[in-house]
Amino acid sequence: LIDNDCILLSYQNCISKLRSIITEDTLVVLKTIKDAGYQAYLVGGYLRDILLGRADLHKDVDIATDAFPQEIMELFNKVIPTGIKHGTVTVIFNDQSYEITTFRIDEEYGDLRHPNSVRYVSNIHEDLSRRDFTINALAYDPFNDTLIDDFQGIEDLKRRIIRTVGNPSLRFKEDALRIFRAIRFSSTLMFEIEEETFKQIKKSCDLLKNISKERIRDEFNKLLLSDKPSFGIELLRQSNILSFLIPELNSSFGEQQNEYHLHDVYYHSLYSCDASSKSVVMRISALFHDVGKPRALYECKSSGIQDNVFYNHEVYSEQIALKFLNEYRYSKADIDIITKLIRYHMFHYTLSWTDGAVRRFVSKVGEDLIPYLFALRVADRIGNGKNIGYPAILMTFWDKINQVIKENHALKITDLAIDGNDIMKTFGLKPSKLVGNILKALLELVLDDQELNKKDILLQKAEEIYKKLISNLDNFEESE
């Protein structure tokens, strides 16, 4: 959250605020550089976040200097050459990271992301002129209380404005990722994007197609973790970026739902995302959980169903989410969780469910994911604009599930009283799908009746299952 008092500070009060927050260790690092005869300034996002009351959110401290990387490496014991090609090294001092970059201006950008080369310069003013946004183009020397603000960044902080340093067209052609970063900063800070800057975002958005999927993913994740991600996602739609980032979500704008929802599919998805907990997995799950509704509606209409219904929309939503997650290189672990949450978010518990049905539900969803699935259901309810919190039936289901978990019921194949080795030894089998199929069939029996989970009983049941599977296989081969 932003400290509103901070952005109302005068120039002199800004200096006082910076002086009060900067740590002794940071002063030691700066003094080490200055005592060696070089200039050293705190710069960029670190200053911005201090002035906005967000210093605790900024892990790295950014420093600009006229010292070359090799000269910095001689001054400190632990230095990592993180971006030495572009003049950047990272100093580790008392477990704090300091990203130190030589004053520079960037030469021509060949890949719309990185400069082909950099040219070192001797003063901070030239260095600040190459930066992306005015609120990031600040520099401060705490030893003489000099705050350099060549591009009215302090004023833009006060006005809550995201504005490029200089010509937005040139800034975006230099580094197209700045297009997404502008929207991400707008979302995380709840700032407006200056009119000319936003016009150029709309004109230049196709440049993002030249940026790696991983870079866009990282910016999108940061946007999702803002206090109100719907703010940033709406900017993605207005700027036409959403049309190629998540085209299915973009096309859900204006797709009306039934009387149980106050909002269309698009805004319902955004508000559900806002209502979910601050994790990438939960926010993506909430954002995509209903994105398959337009396709589901089309399929229903094509089948002659005239009502405004969305049968199997969770199936289509999972497919759309999977496509996005693979395209933007999310981890397999995240993909597995997100797709499973979307797949099962339409669960419908009634009091007629048997204990076996409850166990089967926990088994297919996974015990670890149950709390996340319920959290998604709550976010879904909040996002429809009419319902808030847990209905009584959902609380009853939650209690039932917790009882099953507390009583250590067998819910997975590994919970069975026998394993694959027992199956192979008993029937003289080698590792195969047949062994796995027998274990799956045994688990289905145990989910219905926990009393069956005894070794002698399961081996007896396994023999019946084995004979049936072999018989079915023989009949299939004869029909061939």
How should each PLM-predicted stretch be described?
Residues L1-E480:
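Catalytic cores of the polymerase beta-like nucleotidyltransferase superfamily
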